[in-house]
Design a protein with these regions (language model features):
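Feature captures the catalytic ectodomains and active-site-proximal regions of enzymes
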Residues: 1-306
Length: 306
């Protein structure tokens, strides 16, 4: 009989000593922010040089297994410092919040795209702030959980408090602002233009820039698509050109939040009415990490093979 591990081939588990959490912890440590998490030694060594500008660029979805086949000898791979894992669940909501908060998902509570809240009696899309299934607005709810139980102190706030410098975020125009110094940018060109403009300012600063691609293209077209390949190659070329122009007192750290893998076969719960009969309410969280609310009299009927 096979073990559980043998039944789960090619599963990449998070390593919380070599993960994106440790990457952002190194940046917090550089700015003397108090944190209980371990930093990334390889990045700590690079940051021993005191930089005027620290720039973190997050390319959503551009994991190791996406980048390497597309550009095995490009600018990103040539300057690779270390391979790190994402957090769990390895999804934008959980991973991006790890960068924003400097804490893992099990501390922030930001664990998935769609999370159930008793305050609303329904599942909510965490980044869009809407009801998950009917996409209803939550504006008339008695409590805004994003201002109460789901609120957290951002790395921008922490860095400005401890280091007494300005911390900027560069984000897509649809995103919620997490810094009091937020700049909207929807393309790689706009991201680069804003980084170059900020770096020209002689003050010390931290800049975090986020691109929602290649993730959006990977979801829509797949990991082997021309669309995703073209974006990554173009972004790599333009970021390389930018880095070559930036002054020596500026460091650019480039990372992903998670990777991607094509699915071979998909299943819909809607095709299994007997299974739906067991649920109190629809599943939530992520397709890669689902939660189920099971009717008490149906628990013995279900067997998930665990």
């Amino acid at each position: 009989m096979k073990s559980k591990e043998e039944n789960m081939p090619n599963i990449v588990l998070p390593n919380y000593e070599h993960s994106i959490l440790n990457t952002i912890t190194s940046i917090l440590k550089y700015y003397n922010v108090e944190t209980k998490h371990k930093s990334l030694e390889s990045l700590d060594n690079i940051l021993k040089k005191k930089y005027r500008n620290v720039v973190l660029i997050i390319l959503d979805g551009m994991g190791e297994h996406i980048l390497t086949p597309i550009s095995p000898n490009g600018f990103f791979k040539k300057h690779e410092v270390e391979k790190v894992t994402s957090v769990y669940p390895s999804t934008t909501t959980a991973a991006l919040t790890t960068y924003y908060a400097g804490k893992p998902p099990y501390e922030t509570g930001w664990i998935a795209w769609s999370q159930y809240f008793k305050e609303y009696g329904r599942a909510v899309d965490m980044l869009a702030h809407i009801e998950s299934y009917k996409h209803d607005s939550l504006k008339d709810a008695r409590e805004n959980v994003f201002e109460t139980i789901m609120n957290y102190k951002t790395v921008f706030q922490q860095i400005e408090e401890f280091a007494k410098i300005k911390a900027y975020e560069i984000m897509p125009s649809y995103s919620d602002r997490r810094s009091k110094r937020t700049i909207k940018a929807d393309t790689i060109d706009e991201i680069i233009d804003n980084i170059e403009t900020l770096v020209e300012n002689p003050e010390k600063k931290f800049i975090m820039a986020y691109s929602d691609n290649p993730d959006g293209l990977l979801h829509k077209y797949g990991t082997d698509s021309k669309e995703a390949t073209d974006f990554i190659k173009e972004a790599e070329q333009k970021i390389s050109e930018m880095c070559n122009k930036l002054p020596d007192d500026t460091i650019v750290i480039i990372s992903a939040d998670h990777g991607h893998k094509n699915i071979e076969k998909s299943y819909s719960i809607l095709d299994y009415p007997d299974l739906q009969e067991c649920f109190i309410m629809p599943p939530a969280l992520e397709s890669r990490c689902l939660t189920f609310w099971i009717k008490p009299n149906m628990k013995e009927k279900l067997n998930f093979g665990l």
